């Protein structure tokens, strides 16, 4: 583990999520969320429309299922180097079970997410296999300041609110993040966090910017891409040692909630491992809450 990774892990472990896993006490009944989010960096524009429906059994247990739709627009440089064109398509359909607990000061949540391989592997929208992610989140409130932390284990790296990744992976990973947010006003919050993805064992890296060709899938490729950049920039599907799939970085953001059921957010993420500078943005709409508030 290099020095940058150790620093990020320390930041995560000792930091006193803009988007907590349980941002408020859930209302019992059916839920319906729409979220559109994206990332812009040196490799292109990566956006996703995510539709989720579910049911809150009570304040402690909820179930949900959803389907993301991806839109990938490679940068001019990527198109020139590897000939990639724009691509759209569905991702993996997923199901979730979430356990929650809350007091006046602390929120905790444990979420199990399982996906089925419905996305196109050649476009990088799926690993071609079912995936499982178990994430555990907490936050503590001290007035306007809310530190948070999360640790999880999975067999594939996932996108986050801060980073729509230009790739996905197959193989065991541990992921951690931590930081804090500050409530500037009733509808405005800012925050910062650090994250780390720590793989174990060989990893299959599947690119969303390098398309599959007759010779691009190499089960034993050791290509390291260009310099500090990731193999996913030039190779569509390759098996690499864990070090080449490791990632760590930092994020900062602003969130505005003009209404109880609508969130706008945007910010910056720096992947120090892959030298990627990403501007991210998104809008989330709690359609279920809007419908209930209108008495439908």
Feature-to-residue mapping (PLM):
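Short glycine/proline- and aromatic-enriched beta-strand/turn motifs that initiate or cap beta-hairpins
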Residues: 20-57, 63, 70, 97
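Transmembrane beta-strands of outer-membrane beta-barrel pores
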Residues: 36-42, 67-73, 101, 114-120, ...
């Amino acid at each position: 583990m290099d020095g940058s990774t150790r620093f990020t892990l320390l930041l995560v472990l000792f930091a006193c999520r803009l988007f907590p896993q349980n941002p408020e006490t859930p209302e019992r009944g059916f839920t319906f969320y729409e979220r559109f989010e994206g990332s812009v960096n040196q490799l292109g524009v990566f956006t996703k429309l995510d539709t989720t429906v579910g049911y809150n059994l009570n304040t402690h247990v909820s179930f949900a299922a959803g389907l993301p739709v991806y839109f990938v627009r490679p940068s001019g440089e990527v198109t020139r180097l590897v000939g990639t064109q724009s691509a759209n398509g569905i991702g993996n359909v997923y199901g979730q079970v979430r356990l929650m607990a809350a007091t006046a000061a602390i929120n905790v949540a444990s979420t199990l997410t399982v996906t089925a391989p419905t996305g196109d592997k050649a476009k990088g929208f799926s690993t071609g296999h079912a995936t499982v992610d178990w994430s555990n989140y907490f936050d503590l409130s001290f007035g306007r300041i809310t530190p948070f932390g999360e640790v999880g284990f999975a067999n594939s790296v996932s996108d986050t609110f801060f980073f729509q990744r230009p790739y996905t992976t197959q193989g065991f990973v541990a992921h951690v993040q931590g930081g804090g947010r500050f409530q500037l006003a009733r509808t405005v919050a800012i925050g910062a966090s650090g994250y780390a993805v720590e793989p174990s064992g060989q990893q299959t890296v599947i690119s969303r910017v390098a398309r599959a060709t007759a010779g691009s899938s190499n089960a034993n490729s050791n290509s390291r891409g260009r310099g500090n950049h990731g193999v996913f920039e030039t190779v569509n599907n390759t098996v690499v040692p864990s070090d080449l799939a490791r990632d760590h970085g930092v994020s900062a953001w602003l969130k505005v909630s003009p209404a109880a059921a609508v969130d706008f957010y945007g910010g910056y993420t720096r992947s120090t491992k892959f030298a990627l500078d990403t501007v991210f943005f998104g809008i989330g709409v709690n359609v279920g809450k809007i419908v209930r508030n209108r008495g439908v």
